[in-house]
Design a protein with these regions (language model features):
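Short pre-catalytic strand/loop immediately N-terminal to key active-site residues, enriched for Gly-Thr
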Residues: 83-93
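Active-site-proximal alpha-helical scaffold in enzymes
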Residues: 91-104
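Conserved "HGTGT" condensation-loop signature of ketosynthase/thiolase-family condensing enzymes
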Residues: 1-84
Length: 104
């Protein structure tokens, strides 16, 4: 049996859009719009434009049926390298924690 040592993972930081009440400020924004804005803010903060990351993990509390492959579409909407793989997770109230556990 072949032993693979644990992979080193770095969670470099995070960004989010500001909180607001439901059905107010973000009513006309899509999940993709909001997630892409948060991801691009992270890319800008850490000067990652053009870089291919090992994985991008994004979370949404609720997704619409049109949000298929949401994280991948968001990566393509940023200045990250298009080859960067991505996945998203939906978990009400625990999305960020669950995503960090999966990545780490």
């Amino acid at each position: 049996m072949h032993y693979n040592p644990p992979r080193r993972v770095a969670i470099i930081g995070g960004r989010r859009i500001p909180f607001c009440r439901a059905n107010t400020s973000y009513t006309h924004q899509s999940n993709q719009d909001m997630m892409t804005a948060a991801l691009q803010a992270l890319v800008d903060a850490y000067r990652l434009g053009g870089e291919r990351l090992g994985d991008v993990a994004l979370g949404a509390v609720m997704k619409h049926s049109r949000d298929w492959n949401l994280a991948r579409e968001c990566v393509l909407g940023t200045t990250l390298a298009a080859e960067t793989p991505a996945f998203d997770l939906q978990r009400a109230c625990g999305t960020s924690l669950e995503t960090a556990i999966i990545v780490g």
